Amino acid sequence: MLYSLLLCECLWLITAYAHDDEWIDPTDMLNYDAASGRMRKSQVKYGISEKEEVNPDLSCANELSECYNRLDSLTYKIDECEKQKRKDYESQSNPVFRRYLNKILIETKKLGLPDENKHDMHYDAEIILKRQTLLEIQKFLSGEDWKPGALDDALSDILINFKFHDFETWKWRFEEFFGVDPYNVFMVLLCLLCIVALVATELWTYVRWYTQLKRVFFISFLISLGWNWMYLYKLAFAQHQAEVAKMEPLNNVCAEKMNWSGSLWEWLRSSWTYKDDPCQKYYELLLVNPIWLVPPTKALAVTFTNFVTEPLKHVGKGAGEFIKALMKEIPVLLHIPVLIIMALAVLSFCYGAGKSVNMLRHVGGPEREAPQALQAGERRRQQKIDYRPHGGAGDADFYYRGQISPIEQGPNDNTYEGRRDVLRERDVGLRFQTGNKSPEVLRPFDLQEAEAREHPKVVPGLKSPNLESKPREMGEIPGESTPTESSTESSQPAKPVSGQKVSEGVEGCPAVEKAQLRTDAAGGPEEGSTCSPASTAVEVCG
C-alpha cells in the first residue's frame, strides 16, 4: 500500500514537471525559445538563498548584476590578452633596437667615446631614408603586422658616415647667403674703385687714349702669359697622372732586376721589333716632372696665338651665324649678289677705319696752345706764354715755365725775360745748324724773328747811313762786331752810354714808351744797328 502511494506521487510529480515545460511564461521572454516554442530551463543558481528564489521582485536585479559580472570578466580577459600581446611585441622589437644601438656604439667607438676627460662628444652622421624603410617604420608605429628582419635592415641603413661635428661648417658664410664668392666681390669692387678714382681725379685726361690702349693690351698680354702657362701645366699634369695610371701593371716588372734571360729577350725584342721599351716610358713618367714639359716659350707661343686667333674665332663664329640666318630667308639666286655687297661693305668699313686712324691721335690729352696771330700796326710783343703742356701722368711733358701775369712782374722782369728769350732763340739757331733734337717746340714767331735777325730791315727816315761805320760812337764795346762773334753779339742787347740820359729827358713822350715796348719784345736792337729805339724816339719827339 505504501509502495503504491509512493509510486502515485512520483507519477504526479513527473506529469507536473512535464506540464511545467509546456507552460509559457509571458513575463520571462529571455528564456523563451522561439524555435521550439517552449520555455528554456533555468540553470541552477548556486549561493542563492531560498528567500531570493521565492521573491520575484529581485529577478531583474539579479540578472543585471550577472551581466555586470560577466562584463567584468570579459574586460579582465581582454586586458590579459593585451598584456600578453604587448609582451610578444616587445620581445620581437627588442632585438631590433639592440642591434641598432649596438651599431651606433660601434661607429662612435671608432672616433672615440666619452670618458672622464671628455664628458660630452658631438658627432655627425648622414641619414638615408628610402621608401621601403619609411613603410616599415610606419607599420611598426601603427601596430600593424611588421617583420623584424625588414625593420632591422631599414634601421641599419639609416645612419652612415659617422664623423666629429665641425662647428665651423655651421657658421654663417657669405657665399651661402649671397651665392657669390667674397673674393670675386672684392675684386669687382676694387675694379670699380679704380674706375671711380680715374674719373674723379681726371687722370685719363693727361694720358692719350692711344697710349692707354697700348698699355691695356700689354698688361693683358702679360696676364695671359701667366694664365696660359698655368693652364698648360695643369693639362700636362693631368696627362702625366693618366699615363702613370696606365703604367701601373709595369711597376713590379720594371722594378725587378733583369737576369741574363730577360736581357737576352729584351735585346731580341729591340732588335727585331719597333716597339718602344715600356720600362723606359715608365721611368720617364716617374722621373720627369710635368713642370718641365711647359717651357715659357711654349706659353708665349700659345698666348700670342690665342691673342690673335681667339678674337677672330668669335668674330668668325658670329659672322657665320649672321650669314646663315641671312641666307636662310633669301632665295638661292640672290646669294651671290648679297655676298658681293657684304664684301664691299666690309672693305669700305676697313678703308674708313684706316682713314680715321689719324683722327684718333688727337683724341685724349691736352692740346698745345695755338700761337697767337701777329698784332696789326706793330711788331708782335713776346708774351710769357706756356708753350709746354701741363705735367701729367707719364707721357705729358713736365711743366717748368709758369705763366707770369703783368701784375706779378717786377721792374727788372722785362729785361730778364727779354734776355732769356734771346738766349732761347740763339739755342734754336744752333739746333738748326747742328741738327740736334730737343723736346722744346719751335713756334712760328721764333722762325720769323730768326730770319729778321739774319736779314735786318732798314727803316727809312729813322736810321742814318753813317751809323754803321761808327759803332764806337754809340757806346758799343770795341771788338764785339767781329764775324766770329756775331751770334754772341746778336744775343746780347746793346748798352748805349747816353741812353740813360736821353731816357731821363724824354720820359713823358709816347714814342719813347712805344719804343721801349718794342725793345722789350725784341730783346735788343737788330744786329748791325747802332741806334736804339729810344734815341730814335728822341729825335721824333724832339
Swiss-Prot record:
GO MF term (any one): chloride channel activity
Q: Which residues form the signal peptide?
A: 1-18
Gene source species: Bos taurus (Bovine)
What is the official name of this protein in its record?
Answer: Chloride channel CLIC-like protein 1
The biased composition feature labelled Low complexity covers 480-491
Q: Give the reaction(s) catalysed.
A: chloride(in) = chloride(out); bromide(in) = bromide(out); nitrate(in) = nitrate(out); fluoride(in) = fluoride(out)
Q: Which residues carry this modification: Phosphothreonine?
A: 482
Q: Which residues lie on this side of the membrane: Cytoplasmic?
A: 206-216, 351-542
Q: Where in the cell is it found?
A: Endoplasmic reticulum membrane
Name positions with the PTM Phosphoserine.
438, 464, 532
Q: Does the keyword Protein transport apply?
A: no
Which residues does the UniProt site feature Ca(2+)-mediated inhibition of channel activity point to? Answer: 25, 181
Please tell me whether the keyword Membrane is annotated for this protein.
yes
The organism's lineage is:
Eukaryota, Metazoa, Chordata, Craniata, Vertebrata
Residue ranges, Lumenal compartment?
A: 19-184, 238-329
Q: How does it sit in the membrane?
A: Multi-pass membrane protein
Q: Which GO terms describe its cellular component?
A: chloride channel complex; endoplasmic reticulum; endoplasmic reticulum membrane; membrane; mitochondria-associated endoplasmic reticulum membrane contact site
Q: Which GO terms describe its biological process?
A: endoplasmic reticulum calcium ion homeostasis
State how it assembles: Homomultimers. Interacts with mitochondrial protein PIGBOS1 (via C-terminus); the interaction occurs at the mitochondria-associated endoplasmic reticulum (ER) membrane, a zone of contact between the ER and mitochondrial membranes, but does not appear to play a role in ER-mitochondria tethering and is not affected by ER stress. Interacts with CALR.
Chain segments carrying region Disordered: 369-394, 452-542
Give me the segments passing through the membrane.
Answer: 185-205, 217-237, 330-350
Question: Main localisation, per the record?
Answer: endoplasmic reticulum
